């Protein structure tokens, strides 16, 4: 069976969040708020883990890609809003909960299980697994279903590079992603806000698209805990809820996986 992977230019228009839909939803939510129904607003040689207390740590050897700020033609969102206004329900549902309650989140050591329809399933040390890859900066606009967006300079590697290393079986059709389940560290998981752990999925062609990345940082620095440390998925043509954070498992499947949303 020949598995064909889409090029970045082959993402179907129907799968991209349209600007019109985004703006219409934004207008609707703003109107609702006014009416009283709204709500509050190189190679990886250095560590790829946020240190205790979540200080800012530079990543070395980050290369520019063709997905630059100049190519996008938009201003970058400041570091402050990116790291202080977050959806990461594992730490709480308020926008400031992730930055407040993730400071002591331990991301080292970190293991990643890759299994399912692959040739070399296993449990991998994340830092060792990433070492052969060169980091790239990718500037993408991330849109939230809540009608806000940010332009973020992510640092990471193509997800396809990760999957290719373990070998894709010809009958793999989907890729499932699973976030860490640890209520002692992630206070939000003590409440049944969602069915834990958080799960998401992509079709195999979406996962292998060169735009889809495993991000390990932003603004040239190690990924902050509240943004999904030590690594997260970034799928720029989908809403942010499709990009799982603090991932511990990637499974290639033959059947469409169940997801949180």
Annotate each language-model stretch with its function:
Residues 1-23, 27, 34-37, 41, ...:
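N-terminal secretory signal peptides
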Residues 53-261:
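Structured, non-membrane catalytic/scaffold regions adjacent to prosthetic-group chemistry
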């Amino acid at each position: 069976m020949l598995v064909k992977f889409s090029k970045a230019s082959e993402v179907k228009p129907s799968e991209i969040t349209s600007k019109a839909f985004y703006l219409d939803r934004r207008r609707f939510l703003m109107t609702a708020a006014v009416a009283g129904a709204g709500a509050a607003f190189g190679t990886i040689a250095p560590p790829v883990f946020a240190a205790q207390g979540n200080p800012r740590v530079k990543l070395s050897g980050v290369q520019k890609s063709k997905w630059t700020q100049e190519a996008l033609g938009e201003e970058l969102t400041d570091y402050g809003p990116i790291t202080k206004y977050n959806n990461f329900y594992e730490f709480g549902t308020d926008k400031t909960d992730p930055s407040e309650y993730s400071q002591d989140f331990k991301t080292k050591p970190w293991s990643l299980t890759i299994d399912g329809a692959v040739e070399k399933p296993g449990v991998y040390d994340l830092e060792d697994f990433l070492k052969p890859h060169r980091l790239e900066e990718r500037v993408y606009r991330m849109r939230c279903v809540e009608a806000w967006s940010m332009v973020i300079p992510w640092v990471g590697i193509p997800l396809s590079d990760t999957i290719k290393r373990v070998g894709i079986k010809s009958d793999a059709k989907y890729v499932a992603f699973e976030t860490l389940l640890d209520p002692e560290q992630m206070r939000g998981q003590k409440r049944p806000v969602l069915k834990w752990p958080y799960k998401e999925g992509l079709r195999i062609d979406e996962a292998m698209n060169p735009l889809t990345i495993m991000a390990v940082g932003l603004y040239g620095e190690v990924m902050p805990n509240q943004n999904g440390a030590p690594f997260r998925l970034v799928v720029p043509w989908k809403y942010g809820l499709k990009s799982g954070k603090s991932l511990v498992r990637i499974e290639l499947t033959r059947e469409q996986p169940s997801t949180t949303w």
